Each structure stands twice: as C-alpha cells, then as structure tokens.
Amino acid sequence: MTPFPHVIDIDDSLRHARELMSRHEVRHLPVKKGAALVGVLSDRDLKRALDPDLGLAPKDELFVRDVFVPDAYIVDSSEPIDTVLDHMAAEHIGSALVTKHGHLAGIFTATDACRAFSRHLRSLFPRRTPDDVA
C-alpha cells in the first residue's frame, strides 16, 4: 500500500493529472471534490480519454470530472487483505482506496499485491546460488 497518496481534484485538467502521475511515477490518483473522496483516476482512463483516435475534445478541454471512475473501490484499513484481493480480482479492479476513520489513508494497487506476493514466495523458497548446489 502507498500511504498518503497524491490526490487530484475533480476540477483539475487531464494535463495536470498526467503531469502528476508522471512526476510521482504512479498509475492511480484518488479524486477529491473539496474534502470528499469521490473516485479514482487511472492512467488507463487518462490514456483512453487522450487518445486522438477516439475523437474526444483536445486534452486541455478535458477535466478529471469527465473521465474518472466515480464508483471506486473504497475499503477501511481494517478490511482483511484476502477480502480486498478477492474483490479486486472478481471485479477486475486495479486499485483500492484505503480509508481510516473515514479519511484517505492510502491506495493499494495490483502492483502492491504482486510485490507482496513476490516477497512471500521468496520467504518460502529462498533463491539458490550456484554455490548452494555444489
């Protein structure tokens, strides 16, 4: 999980969203309207909206509100991780917004899940070096 992720306002431009994602090397941005958490914007949503083949408005005319996902998966920090993973897999979701006491505390992504699973596998099956075989 990435604690205290960068967020974007629903009224910000997609150009600003792209710059923010690029600068911080993230693929998901929680979306807020004022203090309220209202959804998530993914790099996939952004790329699709800015694809010239789709004939959408020029990028400077599009805003986060035009393309973000309003029904983001939001979980409390106490939610068991297996429940979160099952839901993400079943719904083909790339991220879960994590809250604590009703406030955004982090974002858990499919990349985070892969990293954790990789660490777990290495703890179970340590890598062998050529010297271990001899």
Locate each region found by the language model:
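The conserved cystathionine-beta-synthase
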Residues: 7-25, 32-33, 74-92, 98-99, ...
